[in-house]
Structures are given as structure tokens and as C-alpha cells.
Amino acid sequence: IDLAEAEEAVRRAVDLAEQRAQVQIESVLVSTSAGRIASELLAASINISHASVSDNDITRVLAAGSRRAVRPGRVVLHSLPIRFTLDDARGIRDPRGMVGHRFGVDIHVATTDTAVARNLMLVVESCHLDVEAMVASPYVAGLSALADDEADLGAALIDMGAGTTTIAVFSGGRFVHAEGFAIGGSHVTMDLARGLSTTVYDAERIKTFYGSVLGGGIDERDMITVPPLGTDDREPPQYVSRATLLRIIRPRVEEILEMVRDRLAASPFAAEPRARVILTGGASQLAGVAELATRILRRPVRVARPLGVSGLPDSAKGPAFAVAAGLLVYPQVANLEYSEPGRARHLMTGTGGYAARLGQWLRESF
């Protein structure tokens, strides 16, 4: 990755946003799908200082759990309590005011590589912006794309991005697992570019308009035009069948979904036999992906659009916008996380004039 190009891209995006929304942007939320996102479920317990559980006790036990998550080369993205315990009682959602002696917590900690996080911070701060929080992409995609019942009953959010595929598992209304791997939709594009001897730009266009992972109804005689590679205008275009595209695209998508299946089998999702899978991200829009995923994962699957943000224009309601929409939802749930003293997240709730102007800009700009 070229950090200078990344910085220029951030500057252009921020400049455009400031012009359209008529606000000066001083701080941002940053989502990441890189850095080998991983999860740990940790337990910690303390003796409570008074007869009943206080806010201070909750802070102390969360701090004890988060300290156990510190690993060389890793940085914490999220630290979320899953359930509390008090003496022999388990599964407590809100322990404040309850009477007991030994107070514990099961906490989910999501981390990423420190080097990746530092480079992202460097790019953003080089644009004279403060980073309010760095969040895991599949988590915020889930915030915008999952229905409440799905998060409560159990679901896996699979964000099929360009360079990565990331996973977030939800159960009991809680975010309980995250991970990812560095294969995504851009790998399908590169397979097409090589297989068809065409440019990456044309391969992406062909994938978007003609790509599919299911063979039903595809005729070998159904041909499409493929521009040649190179700058010689005299070279005639080639013609390939849509069945040829299928033979190039499907193996890579199968590989991605099989890796997802294996990761889910080793995650808390395996304990939820009736839980469903929700797909987001640009690569999830390939024709037939939901059907193929149902076969490979053996779970109910749907391709999701952002649900958690009202007022989005039609062009920003697709699966590819789930992460972006989730960043608008995240400030409303950020207070559920544990933050180290001095690093508390003071995020806008999305209820003021800024959010209204942002929504107006989105509607007017697309």
C-alpha cells in the first residue's frame, strides 16, 4: 500500500464531504478489515468493594478483563462485556445494585495488528484529522445490516470486501466473535483479468455486469465482448461465453465461502445450529452468491442492505455500503464498550444538526 496515495484519497474524500455537508471535519471514525482481525473471550473476577455492585465495580472488573487481552503486536479495537456473574449467578445483563461477594465478567475483545492500526492512524492524522475510534468493519456492518431478531437469536455477518473477507458473530444481542482473511472480490477481478487477458478495469466491469457463480440458464452461445490487453487499437476484441466467466469466477468464490465455513465451524457460531448468515460487501452482489453460500455453509443466507440508518439515498442502500452506514450507527452503541481511563470515546450520537446535514448531503449527492 502506498501511504502517500492513501493520504491523498482521504484528503479528497474529506474535502468533498466538507463541501457537500457544509461542515468542517475535525475528527473521524475509521473502520478496518485488515490486520488479521481476531477475537478472544476472556473471564475476570474481583471482590466487590461494598455490599452491592456499583459502577466502580463494573469498571474495575472490565479493566481486569481487558488487561488480560494485551498481546505483543496487537491493539484492542473493541472490549465488550458479554455477561456478568455474581457468586453462583450467571448470565446477568445489568448487575448494578445486586448483592454479592465475587463479581465476574465474560468479555469479548477484538484486536488487530498494531502495525496496521498505526499506519491507518498515520494516514488519517497526516490529513490533520483526529481519530475518535478505530472499529472492526464486520462489527459495524452488522450494526447497520442485522435485524434485531437476528442479533438476538444468532447470526454471522460476512462482509465480502475487495481485499478481505471478514466475519462478525452475534448472539444474544451481543457481538461475540470477529476474524477475517485476505481474500476478497478483487481476487475474482484479478482472476478474470488474467484468464481473459484484459485490463483490471475491464475485468471489474465484466464481473459487475455479467459475473455469476451459478450455471443454471447460462448458454455456451451467450457471448460477451472482452477488450484486448494493451494499447494497440488495431487488435480486435475477443469474444467469450458467459459459461467461461462462470468457470473463472466460481472457484474463487467457492474458496472464499469454504474458508468462511471452516472459520465459522471453529467459532461460537457453531453452537448456534439455527443461526443464519448475512452477507454484505461489494462481492456479495455477484449473481448467485447467496444460493452458493447456502449450499456450502448449510445455513439460511441472505444478502443484506443497511437497515440501521434512515434517509439514505437509493444508491447508498446496497450491500457495499453496510460498513459506511454502520459507522453512522456506531456512536450510539460505543458507550457499551470498555475504554481505558483517559481514552474514553466521546462520540456524537447522530441526533444533532451534524447528522441531519450529513443525511441531507447523502440524499442530494447520489
Regions found by a protein language model. Give the residues of each.
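Hydrophobic, well-ordered secondary-structure elements that form the walls
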Residues: 260, 279, 327
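Hydrophobic multi-pass inner-membrane translocation pores used for secretion
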Residues: 272-275, 305, 318, 324
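Catalytic phosphate/nucleotide-handling subdomain of diverse soluble enzymes
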Residues: 289-318, 332
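Glycine-rich phosphate-binding loops at beta-strand->alpha-helix junctions
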Residues: 33, 112, 211-215, 272-296
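Short, solvent-exposed amphipathic alpha-helical segments in soluble enzyme
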Residues: 151, 172, 265, 292-298
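Nucleotide/phosphate-binding catalytic cleft detector across ATP-hydrolyzing
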Residues: 1-157, 174-175, 185, 198-246, ...
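A short acidic Gly-Thr/Ser loop motif
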Residues: 33, 157-164, 170-173, 182-186, ...
